Amino acid sequence: SHNIANSSTVGYSRQRAKIQTSRPITLGAEAGQVGTGAQISAIERVRDSFLDYQVRVETAELGKYSTKLDYLSQVEGIFNEPSDTGISTALSDFFDAFQELSKQSTSSSTRVVVTQKTKTLCDLLNNTYSKLEKLQENSVESVKNSVKEVNSILEQLTTVNNQIRIASITGDQPNDLMDSRDNLLDELSSKFGIDVDKTQFNGNDITATGIGANLNPLVNSEPNGEVTRLSFISEIKANNDGTHTISYFVNGDTEKPKTITVSGLAATEVDTLKKTRILLTDGNGEMIDGKGNIVKDGGTIANPIEKFIPKSGEIAGAIEVQESIGSYMNQLDKMAKGLALSVNAIHSGSMDSNIKDTTKTLDFFVASDGKDEAGISAKNISINALILENPSFINTKENVDAGEGDGSRA
């Protein structure tokens, strides 16, 4: 009846009675014994630990690629290509407008079209970059949320683990509690790969696959055993003496900030920390150095420090996709800068050997935040405000001596 009642319970393992021969009765002085039948010696779960292991390994892989798919699908939606409203169409319209201007250089309406098409292209590049930037920030926020969720799961696992141990010591078979623990393990494995080591009295020691081998487990089967927890890096600040101050939230809780100063961090390691955002700390949220020593809040620690870089799970997916999004942002920057430098060179005549005085010609593209031409990016590219207000400033002549109808430069 217990199996039937829990047929729809998530994570429930079917239970069966383990039956063995009951103790026979000895017939005193007479030879032989009389059997007394059978008895139930235990109620056991029907569960395959090898399948559990395989499922959790694949759950971690699924978590990683599902997360990446989610974010990259959003990237696809941001670019919205191919479409009539994408960057490729706006770029084509931009060049088409200049092509028309080369034929009708004296037409004020054609010049206005050029400025409007240019503004549309710039706005689209700005918005696309900003959306990618926001998506990248969302992936970092996802890591922070996962850190908090993971620590919550670890606390629940610790509680259930202790309950199972106590029940097993007294001779009980805590099947339902073990189901609860397996459910939590399945949930944890979606975040990152885990290793589960069985201990006495049905206890489990739980660690992250390939991470923190010299540290305490994430869940310790010993009731008073030391554990390792995850904390989220909120900021990394470079100091004048070459050290770095790392601010982090204990267990991902924004109301529990702590800071440490780290010496010997290479630039590549700083970049890795900014991307992964996770530190391994003790159960109280204190930092652990590479030798396993505890460093209190406000203290100084020498590199190496214990970093958390999972290879699978949702956290790994959120970390890895940041690099993918960053790559698209860099490509946008290169395109915007290349376009701006090329058009400005042609527009100003600075690439022409027969033009000596270009001081009267405005840059066609500028940076909206006031940076010089070399600082133009997809985030700040803009049409020169003077040209937008007065399209007659668009330079279409081959040289200063050309007639008003000359549109060869356009």
Question: What does each of the following model-derived ranges do?
Answer:
Residues 1-410:
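Structural signature of extracellular appendage/secretion-system components
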